[in-house]
């Protein structure tokens, strides 16, 4: 209201306090936290890295996420004298665990804007998203105090009772798996299922995407969420393909299910045979990008083919490539499953290599 004598605006102190509170609250709520996520240059297996950028008035759209930079000399991606590397945003997802948060997957670029040698995403040749990928990500919940999987039996109970099991004697870490699933779904990731695996403390989730790059993005974001979630429980996530060594326990893989228009529509066993045969002469090239220490897993035992051999067959889980029975029942219209990739492999590099081989087939 107005003071009629002084003819100047007059505000009650309560209005001023309320205005200050609302203004401050708006400024806080108008801030967004963008978590830039990238892969470092460590070998033989890259690690996830991330850092947070706080921005104002963010639209939530990928095109409004700015390029950023980081110290590549601290991640084995640059020398100290010229250490800046660039982060190019390629995918964005809401972060359900942080207020006004977003998870931003990025590619690493050199300072001149070219793709860094560690950038597997840039090697994918699938501009029209004709290739569809479904990755089956296995992992172990690892107890740092015992240096063993969560729930690993002291009496050396043999594997068998733990796969898709229920009960406190058989299933370990279900709460983490369930929370991870919920967070991934809330973030918009296309998780299609989860299950307990053959060993205690071993779990799996499956992600599918119509597009190779997006499938890789979602696997890496899901891995990031899982690593961060495990921090709450004081546990580590172990993606080593054979963390228990040369024992009678299954290792961890990341089976790659894939298709393109030809595989989805051809209706021809001959075409499937030709595509599978295209993989035979390039076993070495595939194994090179299918994950470190995979020789410990691909032994010919525990539902694997030997690392230096190649085979394919209908419903054959001991083959390099399995032809799913559903593909056959649908008249040879479906997909293939490469069972060789290890759980620690880079899905970008897996997809890039598979696409290159499929395109080379004489069909």
Residues covered by each model-derived region:
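Polybasic, lysine-rich low-complexity intrinsically disordered segments
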Residues: 7-8
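Residues marking helix boundaries in flexible regions
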Residues: 17-21
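Glycine-rich, acidic/polar active-site loops that bind/position phosphate-bearing ligands
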Residues: 26-363
